[in-house]
């Protein structure tokens, strides 16, 4: 779209990216070796050097990822011809078994195998040997060009209750692509089938509803193309609000379509979803004939498909692998645990070392430190330790009241345990 810079800005930012960066920075901090341990761990310098190298690699990978994503955004589609070869084979048909029965002189019908037929669908892209881009498609498997292939067998569901609809779906990692599709079913009669092909396109194209298509003047298109045509319509009819540029004042056509007087432009891609439908599949009718003189005759169909740069599928698979960093996170978590264990061991070492050097002084300092912590827990209440050494301190009314409540609590717990024991019996 030539005038993207003039489109109203979305203004809505998701916090997911910031949260991810915050979590990542926190993990980096947790994996840092404390300065107090640098001199005591000989391998610390090597670890820091590895961290510097990791940061450089991360920066390089991020830049390359942005470059790859930018290359995917460029439209590099080309219309090519896919030649399909469709034929059928049969087995155990009556005309095949007639000769076998005469040879075997067998009159037992129940012993005869069940008749069946097999539909074969294959195809390859017609390439120009002199075109470097076409050479990349020369060995591409037939199903690689489709996201879904469906076969509808047009026969009675009462006589053949199962298997009259077959569907193949492409996996995200392209691991189930092949040079053809075969479907085998039981049957001794000729039957019509409907082969429905759903080409794989990036970005995906959509069919517009009749009302939406009449407004934009197009019948189908990708999401960016549809938004671009809608923006051109808005500019041509001067529907953009003069004060709030992100608001669109609907004319009669848009008002009837969206059922609103004004539209918030950043929400238009979401609002137009109800007026978009998947592109109709390429439908090929074919008749499976089980008669003796028509089987294995190949029928050829040429269909036009939009193909993209073959490297784009590899780039998508690579980017999907890059985004899945479960193994790296697991290693980072393990490093964090090791750093925490080292820090804890160092604290224990410092504790025991000070104690061994001067036990009395260390114990006094430790008790004083614990006392300060206790004061903080008690909200800074001053504690007179000399007063606590006197017996009169424990004869105050609050002591008796606390003891009374404590004994009541013990008694209640004992009664509850007795009740629970009797209930179990």
From Swiss-Prot:
<dbReference type="GO" id="GO:0016514">
    <property type="term" value="C:SWI/SNF complex"/>
</dbReference>
<comment type="similarity">
    <text>Belongs to the SMARCD family.</text>
</comment>
<keyword id="KW-0963">Cytoplasm</keyword>
<keyword id="KW-0805">Transcription regulation</keyword>
<comment type="subunit">
    <text>Component of the RSC complex composed of at least arp9, arp42, rsc1, rsc4, rsc7, rsc9, rsc58, sfh1, snf21, ssr1, ssr2, ssr3 and ssr4. The complex interacts with histone and histone variant components of centromeric chromatin. Component of the SWI/SNF global transcription activator complex composed of at least arp9, arp42, snf5, snf22, snf30, sbf59, sol1, ssr1, ssr2, ssr3, ssr4 and tfg3.</text>
</comment>
<dbReference type="GO" id="GO:0005634">
    <property type="term" value="C:nucleus"/>
</dbReference>
<feature type="domain" description="SWIB/MDM2">
    <location>
        <begin position="201"/>
        <end position="278"/>
    </location>
</feature>
<keyword id="KW-0539">Nucleus</keyword>
<feature type="compositionally biased region" description="Polar residues">
    <location>
        <begin position="1"/>
        <end position="16"/>
    </location>
</feature>
<keyword id="KW-0156">Chromatin regulator</keyword>
<dbReference type="InterPro" id="IPR003121">
    <property type="entry name" value="SWIB_MDM2_domain"/>
</dbReference>
<dbReference type="GO" id="GO:0006338">
    <property type="term" value="P:chromatin remodeling"/>
</dbReference>
<dbReference type="InterPro" id="IPR036885">
    <property type="entry name" value="SWIB_MDM2_dom_sf"/>
</dbReference>
<feature type="region of interest" description="Disordered">
    <location>
        <begin position="1"/>
        <end position="23"/>
    </location>
</feature>
<comment type="function">
    <text>Component of the chromatin structure remodeling complex (RSC), which is involved in transcription regulation and nucleosome positioning. Controls particularly membrane and organelle development genes. Part of the SWI/SNF complex, an ATP-dependent chromatin remodeling complex, required for the positive and negative regulation of gene expression of a large number of genes. It changes chromatin structure by altering DNA-histone contacts within a nucleosome, leading eventually to a change in nucleosome position, thus facilitating or repressing binding of gene-specific transcription factors.</text>
</comment>
<dbReference type="GO" id="GO:0006357">
    <property type="term" value="P:regulation of transcription by RNA polymerase II"/>
</dbReference>
<dbReference type="GO" id="GO:0016586">
    <property type="term" value="C:RSC-type complex"/>
</dbReference>
<dbReference type="GO" id="GO:0000785">
    <property type="term" value="C:chromatin"/>
</dbReference>
<dbReference type="Pfam" id="PF02201">
    <property type="entry name" value="SWIB"/>
</dbReference>
<keyword id="KW-0804">Transcription</keyword>
<dbReference type="InterPro" id="IPR019835">
    <property type="entry name" value="SWIB_domain"/>
</dbReference>
<protein>
    <recommendedName>
        <fullName>SWI/SNF and RSC complexes subunit ssr3</fullName>
    </recommendedName>
</protein>
<dbReference type="GO" id="GO:0005829">
    <property type="term" value="C:cytosol"/>
</dbReference>
<dbReference type="GO" id="GO:0045815">
    <property type="term" value="P:transcription initiation-coupled chromatin remodeling"/>
</dbReference>
């Amino acid at each position: 779209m030539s005038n993207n810079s003039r489109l109203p800005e979305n203004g809505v930012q998701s916090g997911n990216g910031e949260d991810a960066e915050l979590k990542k920075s926190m993990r980096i901090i947790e994996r840092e070796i404390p300065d107090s341990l640098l001199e005591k761990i000989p391998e610390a310098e090597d670890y820091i050097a590895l961290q510097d190298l990791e940061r450089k690699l991360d920066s390089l990978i991020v830049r390359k990822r942005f470059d790859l994503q930018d290359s995917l955004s460029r439209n590099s589609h080309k219309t090519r011809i896919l030649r399909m070869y469709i034929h059928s084979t049969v087995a155990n048909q009556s005309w095949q078994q007639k000769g076998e029965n005469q040879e075997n002189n067998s009159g037992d019908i129940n012993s005869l195998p069940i008749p069946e037929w097999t539909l074969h669908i294959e195809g390859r892209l017609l390439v120009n040997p002199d075109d470097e881009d076409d050479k990349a498609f020369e060995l591409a498997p037939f199903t690689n060009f489709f996201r879904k292939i469906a076969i509808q067998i047009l026969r009675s569901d009462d006589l053949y209750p199962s298997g009259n609809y077959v569907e193949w779906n492409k996996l995200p990692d392209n691991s189930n692509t092949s040079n053809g599709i075969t479907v085998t079913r039981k049957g001794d009669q000729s039957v019509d089938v409907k082969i429905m092909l759903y080409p794989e396109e990036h970005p995906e194209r959509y069919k517009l509803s009749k009302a939406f298509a009449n407004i934009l003047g197009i019948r189908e298109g990708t999401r960016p193309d549809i938004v671009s045509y809608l923006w051109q319509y808005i500019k041509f009819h001067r529907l953009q609000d003069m004060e709030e540029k992100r608001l669109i004042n609907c004319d009669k056509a848009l008002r009837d379509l969206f059922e609103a007087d004004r539209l918030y432009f950043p929400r238009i891609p979401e609002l137009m979803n109800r007026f978009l439908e998947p592109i109709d599949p390429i439908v090929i009718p074919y008749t499976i004939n089980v008669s003796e003189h028509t089987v294995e005759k190949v029928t050829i169909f040429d269909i036009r498909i939009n193909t993209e740069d073959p490297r784009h599928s590899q780039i998508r698979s690579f980017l999907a692998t890059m985004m899945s960093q479960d193994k790296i996170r697991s290693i980072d978590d393990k490093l964090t645990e090791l750093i925490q264990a080292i820090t804890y061991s160092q604290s224990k070492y410092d504790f025991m070392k000070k104690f061994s050097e001067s036990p009395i002084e260390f114990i006094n300092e430790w008790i004083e430190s614990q006392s300060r912590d206790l004061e903080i827990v008690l909200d800074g209440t001053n504690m007179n330790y000399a007063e606590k050494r006197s017996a009169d301190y424990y004869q105050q009314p609050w002591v008796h009241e606390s003891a009374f409540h404590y004994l009541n609590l013990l008694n209640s717990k004992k009664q509850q345990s007795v009740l629970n024991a009797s209930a179990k019996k």
